[in-house]
Every structure is written in structure tokens, then in C-alpha cells.
Amino acid sequence: MSELYNLIASCNPNRQSLILTALDGTAAGEKAFFADGSLQWESGKKGFFSHFAENLPDISAPGIITENSTRIFCEFPAHEQKLVICGAGHVSIPVIQIGRMIGCTVTVLEDRPKFADNARRAGADTVLCQPFEEGLKKIPGDRDTYFIIVTRGHRYDQVCLEKIMKKEHAYIGMMGSRARTVKVKQALLEQGADPQILESVHTPIGLPIGGETPEEIGVSIIAEVIQEKNRCRKRGGFTKEILRAILDEKDKDIKKVLATIVTKKGSSPREAGTKMLVYQDGRTVGTIGGGCLEADIIQ
């Protein structure tokens, strides 16, 4: 089974990956991993999932489907969410801190050494202290990359937005007044930029909560990132922490259970696919929402 978890940990976020688990019937417990509709791995030797390669159901969110009287749980790998912040001014600091708090990997681009140092102290995973155009050449982008443009002037905004629009992305947000953002967009349109991508750029950036201080504005920006992430892509619970724990050679002989929500009722905040790894000694990685249910599972 470690082969499956290694596949999940290393899968390309720009490919359509899918994990299937048979919940009942003769194939109960069998798993399979698909990428772009092609079967990459299957746990059983009976080939229960082989026919799915020819007729893979259209699945947009984690949940249960029924195939030939067998219930099958479908989920997607939870790719690492990446924040790329252009600019390390006052607003960027809480964005970095809250971004790390929600589990994102944070990269900051800043051409001023003093401000780059501030980003490092705030906890950014990577800080590129160089011109924005040069720094963005090192950022490949993918469907799990969220670009936040908070530079000190519209000419820098324009440079960043022009380069970012050509990359794969999950989100682009740009701070600035309406007049400033309109000016930047108009200039890029005149240079032949894709109007559809320009229209998708979140300006003004952040949810409209009336934020005034850098901290309040930072909250609104991350809130919008979270909203976009959860609106567009319902992901499963194979977080990097859980995958790291499962694949950790030091604990390979310790028994553990991977608890997964396969369906939910009511207003529980945790979606299908959410996972918690429970060790025999009571340690846990992740959470399925806390409360009495989680306590019972740990017991």
C-alpha cells in the first residue's frame, strides 16, 4: 500500500488524479489510483477497477458512487496549497503568517533587502530578493498556486500581473484602488493580454469586510483565498502531514488506522475525504472535526 501513498505524494497537481476505494462487496477495501483517466495502480489482483479506465465516471467532489451494486468512495489528492506573494510591505506580513497558519507553503518576492528580511522573520518558506520579473521566472505555477500581488506601485503590479497571467494558477488577487487596478488592466489589454484571465483577477483583493489595518486586510485576503479554494476544488484529506506520517520509516512497525469521512450529514464543517491518522499509542495526525465522534474513534 505504500506504493499508493508514494503515488499520491508525488502526483502532478496539473493532472486529474482520482483515488477510488471499494466500500463493500467482494472487492471491499480494494483501492485504485487514476491520473487523467488512466489506471496507474490497483491494490487487488482481480482487476475490479480495470473497467473504470474505459468508462471513468465524471466526479467533481469527494463522495460515494455505486457501480454494479458496489459502493465506491471517490476522492482527490490534497495537493499542497502554495501562496506566492509579490511584495513584502506591511500587508504582506499578516498574509504570510496566516497563510502558514492554514497550511500553505509561502513564497515571497521582494526587491528591497530590508523588506525581504521582514518576510523571512514573518515565517515565509522562501524569499526571493530580486526584481519581480526575475523572481517570477522561478515560479512555475500550477492549479494549486495562489498569487497575491501587493507591491508598492502600479508599475510593479503590471509587471507581476503580466507574468503571472501566463502561468497555471488557482487564484490571482491584486491590491490597489479601483482606479489603479483599472489602469493596470487597461495597459495589459492594450498589450494583448487575455481579457478572460484579466476579468478573473480579484481586484480589489480580499473579501469586503471593511478591513483597515494591515492585519484586517490580511485576514480578508486569506479569507478570499480560502473561499476560492473551497469553491473551486473540493479536495480530500491526504495532507502532506498525513502522507509524511504514513510514509515515515521510523514508525512503520507501529499499528495505525487512517480514519476517513466518506459521507456527512448536517452542518459539519469537515467534508467527505477528510482524514485523521490514529496511532496505536493514541497519537494523531490531522482531525476529522473534533468533538465526541473524533474522541470515540481515537479510543
Annotate each PLM feature.
Residues 1-111, 118-125, 187-189, 228-299:
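Segments forming oxygen-rich coordination pockets for charged ligands
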Residues 113-119, 156-159:
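Short, glycine/polar-rich helix-capping loops at beta-to-alpha or helix-loop-helix junctions
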Residues 133-143:
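Short amphipathic alpha-helix with an adjacent loop that forms part of the alpha/beta core around
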Residues 125-131:
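Conserved SAM-binding strand-loop segment of SAM-dependent methyltransferases
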Residues 92-95, 155-160, 180-183, 270:
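Short glycine/serine/threonine-rich phosphate/pyrophosphate-binding segments
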Residues 107-109, 146-153, 162-187:
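ADP-ribose/adenylate-binding Rossmann-like module
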Residues 175-243:
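Adenosine-phosphate binding glycine-rich loop
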Residues 45, 111-114, 131-135, 153, ...:
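Short, acidic/turn-prone active-site loops that include or flank metal/cofactor-
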